[in-house]
Structures are given as C-alpha cells and as structure tokens.
Design a protein with these regions (language model features):
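A conserved beta-strand-loop-helix scaffold within acyl/acetyltransferase catalytic domains
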Residues: 7-83, 123-152, 156-225
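Short, Lys/Arg-enriched N-terminal segments with co-localized hydrophobic residues
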Residues: 1-5
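A gly/proline- and charged-residue-enriched helix-loop-helix capping module
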Residues: 85-115
C-alpha cells in the first residue's frame, strides 16, 4: 500500500459510470472470475435486485480506479451484490498493493452510513478481505466473526487432455478410460463446439434445456418464476 495514498469512496448511481474502469481493474485483482465482472453484477441487479438499495462504491485516489465495492443494503444489513445461489465467489475488487488504503476508506465511508450488520458471503479462503478488512475493523472496535460457509472444489487443468491423463493415478486413468469406452458402446452421444457468435444464444438455450431435463431441482431453478 502506498503510504501517501489518500482518498475516499464515491457512490455511483449506475454500472455505466464505471464499466470501463471496472473491466480494466479485474486483471489487477487477486481473483478474477465471471462473478466479479460488471456484466454479471448488472444483470443480477436488474433481474433480482428489487426491494434492495444499491451501494456501488468506487475508490479512485489518483487517476485510476484502485478499488470497487459492489454492495447492497436491505433491512439494515449491507452485503455484496448477488446471492449465494448464483455466485460461487463474491468480494471487493482491489488492485494489488492498495488493500490497506481501500479497506480503511471503506470503513470510513460505512461509518457515515446507517447499517446494523455487514455480511460478506462467499469469500475465498485467501481473500484480502479476510487478511486486511477483518483486522482493520477489529482495530476500530467492531466485532468481527469469520466462519467457514462452504467448500468449493476446484482443479487447475493442464493445457491438454493427454497432460490431464498423465496427472491421474494409474487406477484413475484406467477407470476413466473404462467409462469412456462404456459411454461409446452403450449410448449415442456427440460433443458440440460453438464456434460462431451468431449461434451462441441458440446453443445456450439448448444447453439450458438439457440442464433442466437432467434434474428436477435444476428445472425448478431455471424456471423464470
């Protein structure tokens, strides 16, 4: 964090005010997933943000945006935009090296707002919110509770299928090949690749339809109502 960096969070009225800078900031954040993109956040807000107050905050102490706080307020509780069902991860967007200045500015801003509880769900275990905001809040006298919410499995895939097979144990490789042979012999299946942007919308509809047919729970989830 720059020792001489000063600044305050600015509240925005729309995603359009910050969309370009938001997209540029993502590549400088510790975590960059689709859930943090302005497109994802905007669609969620437009479709599911009813009865909530948006607190979209930008931190720009110099000429570039170094932090964004995508928050909402409802019944005295401030939390991230989104919800646990549609977001694997949620967090503040903070440029690396600016964590202390951003989180101090965030606490300064929140101290001037009406709220009873700050609930930050779906943080990854290595989130800088846990390593920076939690201790800073405790220093200011806030009661902070950190709980494990859930476990998200993940795997860093190698560059090729052969490399992936090589990473498996001999037993797992044998089992995978056995299942692939069974799939080929007992069912009629095809692998589809969408290579044209013009076909994407139609292919996505087909994909969602297959998801809905695979499980009743998924069908209920994908029902517009």
């Amino acid at each position: 964090c720059k020792a001489d960096e000063m600044g305050a969070l600015v509240r925005l009225n729309s995603f359009e005010e910050i969309a370009e800078g938001w997209q540029a900031l993502l590549s400088s954040c510790a975590i960059d997933t689709v859930f943090f993109t302005p497109q994802w956040q905007k669609v969620w807000w437009q479709e599911l943000g009813q009865q909530k107050e948006m607190l979209l905050l930008s931190f720009q102490p110099e000429d570039e945006i170094t932090g964004i706080a995508p928050l909402k307020r409802e019944n005295g509780v401030i939390s991230f935009l989104g919800d646990r069902d549609l977001y694997d991860y949620a967090d503040f967007l903070v440029r690396k090296g600016h964590e202390d200045s951003f989180y101090n500015a965030l606490l300064d801003y929140l101290e001037g707002e009406p709220w009873e509880r700050l609930e930050l769900f779906s943080l990854s275990q290595d989130s800088c919110t846990l390593t920076h905001l939690a201790p800073l809040a405790r220093q200011r006298g806030y009661e902070v509770e950190v709980r494990e919410e859930d476990v998200v499995p993940g795997l860093s895939l190698p560059e090729s299928w052969d490399a992936y097979l090589s990473s498996l144990s001999r037993k797992d490789r044998h089992e995978l090949r056995r299942k692939l042979r069974r799939l080929s012999s007992e069912t009629e299946y095809r692998c589809y690749t969408c290579s044209s942007p013009d076909e994407l919308d139609q292919d996505l509809e087909s994909f969602f339809q297959l998801m809905a047919e695979s499980q009743e729970a998924k069908s209920r989830f994908l029902t517009p109502e």
